[in-house]
C-alpha cells in the first residue's frame, strides 16, 4: 500500500545516503550507556542520519510508537499491549561505589552494616521514588542514611570522588566512571532493560538497521 512509500523497504534503506531521523525514548542512564556508541557509528558511516532522544511517560509510549513519534523505547518495564514486541538488551546488578582511598576500600568482605554505616548519595528523579535497593533493605529492617538526594546521575561521580559519600548503583555505571566499588551482600534483583518497538515497523529497512545498532551499543556497554 501507500504506507510503504513513507517507510523504507529493507532493500531501499541505505544508511550511507539516508537522511532519516530516528526518535528514541531512553532515559538518563541508557542515554549515557548507548548514545556515545550510536553516534560514533553514525558519524563514521552514515553522516546524514540524525537521532533524537525524548522523555515519554510510560502511559504514552505505545501511542507514540504507533504514530511514529517514537521508533524505539528502552525501559525496564514492557508496556502491556499486543501492538508491540520487545527484547532484553541489558542486565545490570547493583554495587556500592566510593572514592579512591575510601574506608570501604580497606575492608576485605564488605558487609551490609559496613555499607549502612556510610552516608549515602541517592539519585532519583521521582519525588518519592523508593529505590529497588531501599525496598530490599526495608525487608530486613535496614535503612540507609541519605546525606544528599539529587535528580541526575550526571553529577554523581564528581560528588563521590570529592566526598566520603557512597552510591548504590549499577556495576556498569561504576565501570564507566572508573569508580571503585564493592559487592553488596544482599539478594537485590538485577535491573533489566528492554528494547521495545511497534510490530508495524518490522520489516522496515531503517528500523532493522537502527535496532541492530542499539542492540550492539548495549552489548558494548555490558562489557
Task: List the predicted regions and their residue ranges.
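Beta-alpha-beta core module
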Residues: 82-88, 92, 151-202
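Central regulatory/effector-binding core of bacterial HTH transcription factors
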Residues: 17-81, 150
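Short, well-ordered beta-strand segments
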Residues: 21-25, 73, 97, 121, ...
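Short loop->beta-strand "edge-of-pocket" segments that line small-molecule binding or catalytic clefts
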Residues: 23-25, 94, 110-130, 218
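Hydrophobic hinge/microswitch elements
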Residues: 57-70, 76, 126-180
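Short, small-residue-biased leader/transition segments that mark boundaries at the very start
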Residues: 1-6
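Flexible hinge/capping segments at coil-to-helix
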Residues: 81-120, 205-208
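Secondary-structure junction motif
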Residues: 104-105, 118-140, 203-211, 221
